[in-house]
Amino acid sequence: AALAAFLVQLDPTVPQLADMKTAVSEAVTNCIVHAYPDKIGPITMTAAIYEGGIVRITITDRGVGIPDIAKAMEPMFTTGDAEERAGLGFAVMQSFMDKVKVSSTPGRGTRVTLTKRLDARA
């Protein structure tokens, strides 16, 4: 709800809102499941709107980090039980956003930056 309230100033379409909410939900879920496998830890989300309707949302954790980002971004790759996790988190984010950037340091955490241009309604 907070994301939708923030984005309302751009007058997004319902499908645009749904796409962004899905991508952000996936990013936050990944943090909860993977960053802190044995404990609870902080997750920070920031959002900014830039000229031209560019929206950038950054989700950051201070968890275990990702040792091989390229491998983690491969569809179907999972660090958990394949029966419990599909390994599609980053693929889902990429399908709904214009750009997904991931930076991570093992033992220090991960930052996922989601970028999407919201075209003005005609």
Identify the residue ranges that each predicted region occupies.
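Conserved short strand/loop->alpha-helix "switch" segment adjacent to the catalytic nucleotide/phosphoryl-transfer site
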Residues: 1-25
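Conserved polar catalytic motif of the HATPase_c/GHKL fold
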Residues: 26-30
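Conserved beta-strand-loop-beta-strand hairpin that lines the nucleotide-binding pocket
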Residues: 31-122
